[in-house]
Amino acid sequence: NTATGADHGDLTVQLRQDASNSSYATTDVDACCTGATVAGASSAANAYGSSSTTSTVDAQYEQNSTGAESRATTDVYQYRAYDVTAASTAAANSATINNEWGYTAIRGRQTSSTDVAADARLTVGTWSGVAVVSAYGVGTTTLAPNIGSDMVVDIAQMNTGGVDANAQLNGSSSDGGQVLVSSTAVGNGFT
């Protein structure tokens, strides 16, 4: 995994990432009565992140993922919860190129045959406040926010692996609490 950045300068990136391994992240929480619980797991076979300000960015990257699986699992078991979050994010290939007030040129190639799974489970006896369960799985993704200047984008994505997202809440009662349960599965994504 790679991270770069620039402040009032030029950033030129030529990056290749190849992963033939599986990637796993697991978070397991067993608690009684806490004020707030936030639990999360994140897994990525290949990840590239860049953040720049008032810079010229030329980012060229290639990401190839051929491993069997990228899996993130979050399990929270809690007797009494006041505000509780269980979240999982899993990806085969992920790239984020953020630039503010500077020209950005992006050329990305992302391929994956890796199966991706994001599982988030919350089991709670009773809760108040907010109970949030979120699972997000994506094969290949590029996020490219660019504020205040021009951007040129050339992205090609190919995902042949399966993508699964599962968010689950099991609870017996709420003391006026709110619930948000969300799952998202995406093969290829560009934002």
Residue ranges, per PLM feature:
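Low-complexity repeat regions of mature extracellularly deployed or surface/particle-associated proteins
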Residues: 1-191
